[in-house]
Protein backbone atom coordinates (compact mmCIF):
# COMPACT_ATOMS: atom_id res chain seq x y z
CA UNK A 1 0.00 0.00 0.00
CA UNK A 2 1.34 3.42 -0.96
CA UNK A 3 0.66 6.83 0.55
CA UNK A 4 -1.71 7.68 -2.30
CA UNK A 5 -3.87 4.68 -1.36
CA UNK A 6 -4.39 5.83 2.24
CA UNK A 7 -7.98 7.08 2.45
CA UNK A 8 -9.74 7.05 5.82
CA UNK A 9 -13.17 8.11 7.05
CA UNK A 10 -12.64 10.20 10.18
CA UNK A 11 -14.80 9.37 13.21
CA UNK A 12 -16.45 11.97 15.51
CA UNK A 13 -14.73 14.72 13.55
CA UNK A 14 -16.83 17.72 14.51
CA UNK A 15 -17.34 16.60 18.10
CA UNK A 16 -13.64 16.08 18.79
CA UNK A 17 -12.54 19.28 17.09
CA UNK A 18 -15.17 21.44 18.81
CA UNK A 19 -14.30 20.09 22.26
CA UNK A 20 -10.58 20.72 21.71
CA UNK A 21 -11.34 24.41 20.96
CA UNK A 22 -8.70 24.98 18.28
CA UNK A 23 -7.84 28.62 17.53
CA UNK A 24 -5.04 30.85 16.31
CA UNK A 25 -1.94 30.38 18.42
CA UNK A 26 -3.04 27.11 20.00
CA UNK A 27 -0.83 24.05 19.57
CA UNK A 28 -2.54 20.66 19.36
CA UNK A 29 -0.96 17.23 19.02
CA UNK A 30 -2.84 14.69 16.93
CA UNK A 31 -1.29 11.57 18.38
CA UNK A 32 -2.86 9.25 15.81
CA UNK A 33 -2.56 11.20 12.57
CA UNK A 34 -3.92 8.42 10.34
CA UNK A 35 -5.54 9.86 7.24
CA UNK A 36 -5.23 13.38 8.65
CA UNK A 37 -8.95 14.13 8.92
CA UNK A 38 -8.87 15.44 12.47
CA UNK A 39 -5.66 17.37 11.82
CA UNK A 40 -7.10 18.98 8.71
CA UNK A 41 -10.14 20.24 10.64
CA UNK A 42 -7.95 21.52 13.48
CA UNK A 43 -5.79 23.40 10.98
CA UNK A 44 -8.89 24.91 9.39
CA UNK A 45 -9.75 26.38 12.79
CA UNK A 46 -6.40 28.16 12.99
CA UNK A 47 -4.47 25.84 15.30
CA UNK A 48 -0.90 24.67 14.85
CA UNK A 49 -0.97 20.88 14.58
CA UNK A 50 1.71 18.28 15.11
CA UNK A 51 0.56 14.95 13.68
CA UNK A 52 2.19 11.81 15.08
CA UNK A 53 1.83 8.29 13.68
CA UNK A 54 3.74 5.03 13.95
CA UNK A 55 2.53 3.88 10.51
CA UNK A 56 4.96 5.28 7.90
CA UNK A 57 2.38 4.96 5.11
CA UNK A 58 -0.22 6.94 7.05
CA UNK A 59 2.36 9.55 8.04
CA UNK A 60 3.54 9.99 4.46
CA UNK A 61 -0.02 10.24 3.11
CA UNK A 62 -1.18 12.81 5.64
CA UNK A 63 2.01 14.85 5.39
CA UNK A 64 1.73 14.93 1.60
CA UNK A 65 -1.82 16.27 1.94
CA UNK A 66 -1.32 18.70 4.81
CA UNK A 67 2.38 19.55 4.64
CA UNK A 68 1.91 22.67 2.53
CA UNK A 69 0.30 24.34 5.54
CA UNK A 70 3.08 26.02 7.58
CA UNK A 71 1.13 25.30 10.78
CA UNK A 72 1.42 21.53 10.27
CA UNK A 73 4.26 19.15 10.87
CA UNK A 74 4.27 15.37 10.85
CA UNK A 75 6.41 13.29 13.16
CA UNK A 76 7.04 9.55 13.35
CA UNK A 77 6.22 7.89 16.65
CA UNK A 78 3.77 6.13 18.92
CA UNK A 79 1.33 8.19 20.98
CA UNK A 80 2.76 6.44 24.03
CA UNK A 81 5.99 8.33 23.34
CA UNK A 82 4.56 11.86 23.12
CA UNK A 83 6.68 13.17 26.01
CA UNK A 84 9.72 12.33 23.88
CA UNK A 85 8.36 12.84 20.37
CA UNK A 86 6.97 16.30 21.19
CA UNK A 87 9.38 17.30 23.97
CA UNK A 88 10.27 20.59 22.26
CA UNK A 89 6.61 21.69 22.18
CA UNK A 90 5.36 20.78 25.64
CA UNK A 91 3.17 21.77 27.31
CA UNK A 92 0.52 22.18 24.59
CA UNK A 93 -3.10 23.31 24.34
CA UNK A 94 -4.56 20.00 23.27
CA UNK A 95 -3.92 16.33 22.63
CA UNK A 96 -6.13 14.08 20.50
CA UNK A 97 -5.80 10.31 20.22
CA UNK A 98 -8.10 8.10 18.14
CA UNK A 99 -7.56 4.48 19.19
CA UNK A 100 -9.31 2.94 16.19
CA UNK A 101 -7.67 1.03 13.38
CA UNK A 102 -7.84 3.05 10.17
CA UNK A 103 -9.89 1.87 7.22
CA UNK A 104 -6.84 1.35 4.95
CA UNK A 105 -5.22 -0.86 7.57
CA UNK A 106 -8.38 -2.96 7.80
CA UNK A 107 -9.19 -3.02 4.11
CA UNK A 108 -5.77 -3.73 2.59
CA UNK A 109 -5.21 -7.48 2.69
CA UNK A 110 -1.42 -7.18 2.90
CA UNK A 111 -1.67 -5.48 6.30
CA UNK A 112 -3.22 -8.65 7.72
CA UNK A 113 -5.69 -7.02 10.11
CA UNK A 114 -8.92 -8.49 8.79
CA UNK A 115 -10.43 -11.87 8.02
CA UNK A 116 -12.59 -10.36 5.26
CA UNK A 117 -9.73 -10.80 2.77
CA UNK A 118 -6.87 -13.26 2.62
CA UNK A 119 -3.46 -11.87 3.46
CA UNK A 120 -0.41 -12.48 5.61
CA UNK A 121 -1.24 -12.66 9.32
CA UNK A 122 0.68 -9.47 10.11
CA UNK A 123 -1.39 -6.88 12.06
CA UNK A 124 1.53 -4.52 12.76
CA UNK A 125 0.66 -0.82 12.72
CA UNK A 126 4.32 0.01 12.15
CA UNK A 127 7.21 -1.69 10.39
CA UNK A 128 8.86 -3.12 13.49
CA UNK A 129 8.25 -6.02 15.84
CA UNK A 130 6.84 -9.52 15.42
CA UNK A 131 3.80 -10.21 13.26
CA UNK A 132 0.67 -11.89 14.59
CA UNK A 133 1.79 -15.15 12.98
CA UNK A 134 5.15 -14.88 14.72
CA UNK A 135 3.44 -14.04 18.01
CA UNK A 136 1.34 -17.21 17.80
CA UNK A 137 4.39 -19.31 16.90
CA UNK A 138 6.62 -17.99 19.70
CA UNK A 139 4.10 -17.55 22.53
CA UNK A 140 3.31 -20.52 24.76
CA UNK A 141 -0.28 -21.69 24.98
CA UNK A 142 -0.88 -20.37 28.49
CA UNK A 143 0.22 -16.86 27.51
CA UNK A 144 -1.88 -17.04 24.36
CA UNK A 145 -4.92 -17.86 26.50
CA UNK A 146 -4.19 -14.79 28.63
CA UNK A 147 -3.92 -12.58 25.54
CA UNK A 148 -7.25 -13.81 24.18
CA UNK A 149 -8.95 -13.33 27.55
CA UNK A 150 -7.42 -9.99 28.52
CA UNK A 151 -7.40 -8.26 25.13
CA UNK A 152 -10.32 -9.93 23.40
CA UNK A 153 -12.55 -10.94 26.33
CA UNK A 154 -12.90 -14.21 24.44
CA UNK A 155 -14.92 -16.84 26.37
CA UNK A 156 -13.41 -19.69 24.32
CA UNK A 157 -9.82 -18.54 24.82
CA UNK A 158 -8.51 -21.97 25.84
CA UNK A 159 -9.73 -24.04 22.88
CA UNK A 160 -8.85 -21.25 20.44
CA UNK A 161 -5.32 -20.95 21.83
CA UNK A 162 -4.90 -24.72 21.68
CA UNK A 163 -5.98 -24.86 18.02
CA UNK A 164 -3.86 -21.84 17.07
CA UNK A 165 -0.78 -23.50 18.54
CA UNK A 166 -1.54 -26.70 16.63
CA UNK A 167 -2.18 -25.01 13.29
CA UNK A 168 0.32 -22.10 13.52
CA UNK A 169 -1.57 -20.11 10.85
CA UNK A 170 0.31 -17.61 8.69
CA UNK A 171 -2.66 -16.24 6.70
CA UNK A 172 -5.70 -14.29 7.88
CA UNK A 173 -8.36 -16.59 6.44
CA UNK A 174 -6.48 -19.60 7.75
CA UNK A 175 -6.52 -18.12 11.27
CA UNK A 176 -10.24 -17.38 11.01
CA UNK A 177 -10.92 -20.99 10.03
CA UNK A 178 -8.93 -22.19 13.04
CA UNK A 179 -11.16 -20.11 15.32
CA UNK A 180 -14.28 -21.50 13.64
CA UNK A 181 -13.09 -25.04 14.35
CA UNK A 182 -12.29 -24.23 17.97
CA UNK A 183 -15.65 -22.67 18.89
CA UNK A 184 -18.81 -24.82 18.89
CA UNK A 185 -21.16 -23.68 16.11
CA UNK A 186 -24.04 -23.10 18.52
CA UNK A 187 -21.83 -20.70 20.53
CA UNK A 188 -20.97 -18.42 17.60
CA UNK A 189 -22.06 -14.83 18.36
CA UNK A 190 -24.94 -13.39 16.37
CA UNK A 191 -23.77 -9.82 15.83
CA UNK A 192 -20.05 -10.29 15.16
CA UNK A 193 -17.89 -12.83 13.35
CA UNK A 194 -16.72 -15.66 15.57
CA UNK A 195 -13.08 -14.63 14.97
CA UNK A 196 -13.56 -10.93 15.78
CA UNK A 197 -12.43 -11.13 19.41
CA UNK A 198 -9.43 -13.28 18.54
CA UNK A 199 -8.27 -10.90 15.82
CA UNK A 200 -8.76 -7.94 18.15
CA UNK A 201 -6.71 -9.61 20.88
CA UNK A 202 -3.88 -10.55 18.53
CA UNK A 203 -3.77 -7.04 17.06
CA UNK A 204 -3.67 -5.43 20.48
CA UNK A 205 -0.91 -7.76 21.65
CA UNK A 206 1.17 -7.29 18.50
CA UNK A 207 1.00 -3.51 18.80
CA UNK A 208 1.06 -3.19 22.58
CA UNK A 209 -2.10 -1.10 22.39
CA UNK A 210 -3.28 -1.24 26.01
CA UNK A 211 0.25 -0.62 27.26
CA UNK A 212 0.52 2.38 24.93
CA UNK A 213 -2.80 3.70 26.21
CA UNK A 214 -1.65 3.32 29.82
CA UNK A 215 1.51 5.29 29.01
CA UNK A 216 -0.50 8.04 27.32
CA UNK A 217 -2.97 8.38 30.19
CA UNK A 218 -0.13 8.59 32.71
CA UNK A 219 1.59 11.27 30.62
CA UNK A 220 -1.41 13.59 30.15
CA UNK A 221 -0.68 15.88 33.14
CA UNK A 222 2.75 16.68 31.73
CA UNK A 223 1.54 17.16 28.16
CA UNK A 224 -0.99 19.94 28.76
CA UNK A 225 -0.90 23.60 29.68
CA UNK A 226 -3.40 24.91 32.22
CA UNK A 227 -6.63 25.13 30.23
CA UNK A 228 -5.42 22.46 27.82
CA UNK A 229 -7.61 19.51 26.90
CA UNK A 230 -7.00 15.85 26.12
CA UNK A 231 -9.49 13.98 23.94
CA UNK A 232 -9.45 10.21 23.47
CA UNK A 233 -11.67 8.22 21.10
CA UNK A 234 -12.01 4.56 22.13
CA UNK A 235 -13.73 1.77 20.23
CA UNK A 236 -14.26 -1.05 22.70
CA UNK A 237 -14.94 -1.53 26.36
CA UNK A 238 -11.38 -2.35 27.44
CA UNK A 239 -10.02 0.94 26.13
CA UNK A 240 -13.00 3.06 27.10
CA UNK A 241 -12.96 1.72 30.65
CA UNK A 242 -9.29 2.65 31.02
CA UNK A 243 -9.92 6.17 29.69
CA UNK A 244 -12.99 6.65 31.87
CA UNK A 245 -11.21 5.53 35.03
CA UNK A 246 -8.07 7.56 34.33
CA UNK A 247 -10.00 10.75 33.57
CA UNK A 248 -12.17 10.35 36.67
CA UNK A 249 -9.06 9.83 38.78
CA UNK A 250 -7.51 13.01 37.37
CA UNK A 251 -10.67 14.98 38.05
CA UNK A 252 -11.22 13.69 41.57
CA UNK A 253 -7.75 13.06 42.86
CA UNK A 254 -6.64 14.53 46.19
CA UNK A 255 -3.85 17.06 45.61
CA UNK A 256 -2.80 17.55 49.24
CA UNK A 257 0.90 17.14 50.14
CA UNK A 258 1.63 13.53 51.19
CA UNK A 259 2.41 14.45 54.82
CA UNK A 260 -0.97 15.96 55.74
CA UNK A 261 -2.97 13.81 58.21
CA UNK A 262 -6.33 14.70 56.59
CA UNK A 263 -7.45 15.88 53.16
CA UNK A 264 -8.00 19.65 52.99
CA UNK A 265 -8.53 19.98 49.24
CA UNK A 266 -11.94 18.26 49.23
CA UNK A 267 -10.65 15.78 46.70
CA UNK A 268 -10.73 18.30 43.88
CA UNK A 269 -8.25 17.24 41.25
CA UNK A 270 -6.11 19.18 38.83
CA UNK A 271 -8.49 18.29 35.99
CA UNK A 272 -12.17 18.58 35.15
CA UNK A 273 -14.29 16.22 33.07
CA UNK A 274 -15.44 18.07 29.97
CA UNK A 275 -17.58 15.10 28.97
CA UNK A 276 -19.49 13.66 31.92
CA UNK A 277 -20.54 10.78 29.66
CA UNK A 278 -18.83 9.50 26.57
CA UNK A 279 -19.85 11.22 23.33
CA UNK A 280 -21.10 8.73 20.72
CA UNK A 281 -21.51 9.06 16.98
CA UNK A 282 -24.80 10.41 15.71
CA UNK A 283 -27.27 8.21 13.86
CA UNK A 284 -26.36 10.02 10.65
CA UNK A 285 -22.66 9.30 11.12
CA UNK A 286 -23.28 5.65 11.95
CA UNK A 287 -25.39 5.31 8.82
CA UNK A 288 -22.66 6.90 6.70
CA UNK A 289 -19.81 5.07 8.46
CA UNK A 290 -20.88 1.90 10.35
CA UNK A 291 -17.43 1.62 11.94
CA UNK A 292 -18.24 4.71 14.01
CA UNK A 293 -20.98 2.82 15.88
CA UNK A 294 -18.70 1.76 18.72
CA UNK A 295 -16.73 5.02 19.01
CA UNK A 296 -16.72 6.79 22.39
CA UNK A 297 -15.12 10.20 22.91
CA UNK A 298 -14.04 11.44 26.34
CA UNK A 299 -12.39 14.80 27.09
CA UNK A 300 -10.65 16.17 30.17
CA UNK A 301 -9.32 19.70 30.87
CA UNK A 302 -6.34 20.70 32.99
CA UNK A 303 -7.36 23.24 35.66
CA UNK A 304 -4.04 23.93 37.37
Swiss-Prot record:
One of its GO terms (biological process) is rRNA base methylation. Disulfide bonds: none annotated. Coiled coil: none annotated. GO terms for cellular component: cytoplasm. It catalyses: cytidine(1402) in 16S rRNA + S-adenosyl-L-methionine = N(4)-methylcytidine(1402) in 16S rRNA + S-adenosyl-L-homocysteine + H(+). GO terms for molecular function: rRNA (cytosine-N4-)-methyltransferase activity. S-adenosyl-L-methionine binds at residues 36-38, 53, 79, 98, 105. Its EC number is 2.1.1.199. Specifically methylates the N4 position of cytidine in position 1402 (C1402) of 16S rRNA. PANTHER family: 12S RRNA N4-METHYLCYTIDINE METHYLTRANSFERASE, S-ADENOSYL-METHYLTRANSFERASE MRAW. HAMAP family: 16SrRNA_methyltr_H (MF_01007). This is Ribosomal RNA small subunit methyltransferase H. It comes from Myxococcus xanthus (strain DK1622).
Amino acid sequence: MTASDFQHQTVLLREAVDLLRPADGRVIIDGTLGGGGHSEALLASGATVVGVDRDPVALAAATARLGANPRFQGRAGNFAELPRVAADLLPVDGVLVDLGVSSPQLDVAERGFSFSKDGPLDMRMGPDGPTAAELIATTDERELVRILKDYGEEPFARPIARELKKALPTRTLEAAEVVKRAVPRKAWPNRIHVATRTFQALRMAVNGELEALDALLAAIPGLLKVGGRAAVIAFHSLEDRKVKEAFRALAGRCTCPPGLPVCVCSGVGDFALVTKKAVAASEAEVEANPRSRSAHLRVVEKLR
